[in-house]
């Protein structure tokens, strides 16, 4: 699928399909201005269907033998509520409405006058591209795509075409994350994630370090290896480095939880626990590898990025870790494992210690960590915790620009009492109330206090049963866009600071 920008009127684009978004207060005037030659045909048809241009209202009309032969019209509601996220959703909705029409080209006409050109371009292209994503890898027959061959983003100057490659790189990162998370655990495991990381390194000239079990043991990664010891597939600790072409001004670490399947261990997941979906427990790893694929292509000036994941499975076997076992993490802290189904934080513990050893300017980890976060925020919003207000604001702003839901949660220090152990430095779980908070407090024990750090719990938005806006059902690729936006902002700030002296 190709994209291009054009400031020419819709009627002059020569597309066989046109998709419009109209505001409820002025839809007749907008229709006449956008498609003057067809307005007299379309307005009576819309009135017959009692079209009010309410948000989400959508109608399609076929005109065989005419140009365009298909017109799709969507209501946008009132203009005062039409923000960047609404623009992204409108583009996605109109693109999906064209699916199956086998158009050569679809002209997309949405009101973008209130947006900066680059903001509009991002929302329109990502909205369309990601909504039309379809995973056909595991079907016996691949049906031919009937999606538009080209989508023309009307109202944007053709000079903006040079930015389309950057947007395609971001979409490719999201789609890689979706593919990794959606694939079954007999396809994606620690070894295949190593192959994915190596593919990124080879394609874009990055550095990859892979630690096997012996190397992890030499580094004292007892928490990570306690989880891995029950699996028949060997663990792989992945460290991908994306270096800029010039001098390094900032160094960031992205850490992703990489549990390719989570049985719960001896605290086995039972009915209602969605064990059949526990392939998505590596959603954090999927997100950071997806972001790595994008960032490796973009090569942001002055920014060195370290992507880290401790990949393994959490399985039941004769070698699996016992409930009640005490293990030692690589920073020397001892952990009583009172629940083997709280394994992700154990793998992250050693990954965070490793990341701190790189002395980055900031660390962000992503993990499908707790059901408690899903209960609190649902499946559209991730929760995040950070003791650093500056980093927290950066992530909040990045998520807003990316169109991904993110909500800051409290690091209530008194809740740390719930992690007290009578035998070890701490337990790996606390009481059920505030479970996502105690999980974040646990992770905080493995981060040097002088390094800005944030933990993002993506257990809710990593997966969508029914699909939503730009996300088809299944794996969403959540987190990639936010991470890329954050890295871009950090690189821009570093460049601006340098230029100011």
UniProtKB/Swiss-Prot annotation:
- Output one GO MF annotation: manganese ion binding
An example of a Gene Ontology cellular component annotation for this protein is: cytoplasm
The note on the cofactor says: Binds 2 manganese ions per subunit.
This entry's Enzyme Commission designation comes to: 3.4.11.1, 3.4.11.10
Q: Does the keyword Cytoplasm apply?
A: yes
Q: Binding residues for Mn(2+) 1, per the UniProt record?
A: 262, 341, 343
The keyword ATP-binding is assigned to this record: no
- Biological process terms in GO annotation: proteolysis
Instruction: List, from the UniProt record, the residues annotated as the active site of this protein.
Output: 269, 345
Q: What are the annotated disulfide bridges? A: none
Q: Which UniProt keywords apply?
A: Aminopeptidase, Cytoplasm, Hydrolase, Manganese, Metal-binding, Protease
Q: Which residues bind Mn(2+) 2?
A: 257, 262, 281, 343
Where is this protein localized, as stated in its record?
A: Cytoplasm
What highest taxon heads this organism's lineage? Bacteria
Write down the chemical reaction(s) this protein catalyses: Release of an N-terminal amino acid, Xaa-|-Yaa-, in which Xaa is preferably Leu, but may be other amino acids including Pro although not Arg or Lys, and Yaa may be Pro. Amino acid amides and methyl esters are also readily hydrolyzed, but rates on arylamides are exceedingly low; Release of an N-terminal amino acid, preferentially leucine, but not glutamic or aspartic acids
Q: Which cofactor does it need?
A: Mn(2+)
Q: Which family does it belong to?
A: Belongs to the peptidase M17 family.
Protein name per the record = Probable cytosol aminopeptidase
Species of origin reads Synechococcus sp. (strain RCC307)
């Amino acid at each position: 699928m190709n994209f291009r920008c054009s400031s020419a009127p819709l009627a002059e684009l020569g597309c066989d399909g046109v998709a419009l978004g109209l505001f409820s207060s002025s839809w007749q005037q907008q229709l006449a201005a956008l498609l003057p030659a067809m307005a007299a045909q379309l307005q009576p048809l819309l009135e017959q269907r009692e079209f009010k241009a309410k948000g989400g209202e959508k109608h399609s009309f076929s005109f065989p033998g005419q140009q365009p032969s298909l017109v799709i019209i969507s209501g946008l509601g009132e203009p005062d509520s039409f923000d960047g996220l609404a623009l992204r959703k409108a583009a996605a909705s109109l693109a999906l409405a064209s699916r199956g029409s086998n158009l050569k080209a679809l002209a997309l006409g949405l009101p973008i006058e209130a947006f900066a050109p680059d903001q509009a371009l991002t929302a329109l292209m990502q909205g369309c591209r990601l909504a039309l994503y379809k995973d056909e890898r595991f079907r016996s027959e691949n049906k031919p795509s009937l999606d538009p061959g080209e989508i023309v983003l009307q109202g944007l100057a053709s000079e903006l075409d040079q930015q389309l490659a950057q947007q395609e790189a971001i979409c490719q990162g999201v789609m890689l994350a979706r593919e990794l998370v959606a694939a079954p655990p007999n396809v994606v495991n620690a070894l295949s994630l190593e192959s994915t990381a190596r593919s990124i390194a080879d394609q874009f000239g990055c550095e990859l370090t892979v630690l096997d079990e012996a190397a992890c043991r030499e580094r004292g990664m007892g928490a990570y290896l306690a989880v891995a010891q029950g699996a028949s597939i060997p663990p792989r600790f992945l460290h991908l480095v994306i270096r800029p072409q010039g001098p390094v001004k900032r160094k960031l670490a992205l850490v992703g939880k990489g549990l390719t399947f989570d049985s719960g261990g001896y605290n086995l997941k039972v009915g209602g626990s969605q064990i059949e979906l526990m392939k998505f427990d590596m959603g954090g790893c999927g997100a950071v590898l997806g972001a790595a694929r994008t960032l490796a292509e973009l090569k942001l000036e002055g920014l060195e990025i370290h992507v880290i994941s401790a990949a393994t499975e959490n399985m039941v076997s004769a070698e699996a870790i016992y409930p009640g076992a005490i293990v030692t993490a690589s920073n020397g802290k001892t952990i009583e494992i009172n629940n083997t189904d709280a394994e992700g934080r154990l793998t992250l513990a050693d990954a965070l210690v490793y990341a701190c050893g790189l002395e980055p300017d900031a660390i962000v980890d992503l993990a499908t960590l707790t059901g408690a976060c899903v209960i609190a925020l649902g499946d559209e919003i991730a929760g995040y915790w950070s003791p650093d207000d500056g980093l927290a604001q950066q992530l909040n702003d990045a998520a807003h620009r990316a169109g991904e839901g993110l909500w800051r949660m409290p690091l209530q220090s008194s809740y740390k009492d719930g992690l007290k152990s009578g035998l070890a430095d701490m337990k790996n779980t606390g009481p059920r109330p505030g479970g996502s908070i105690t999980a974040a407090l646990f992770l905080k024990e493995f981060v040097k206090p002088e390094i800005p750090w944030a933990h993002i719990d993506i257990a809710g938005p990593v997966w969508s049963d029914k699909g939503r806006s730009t996300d088809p059902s299944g794996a969403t690729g959540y987190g990639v866009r936010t991470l890329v936006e954050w890295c871009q902002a950090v690189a821009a700030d570093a460049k601006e600071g340098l230029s100011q002296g």
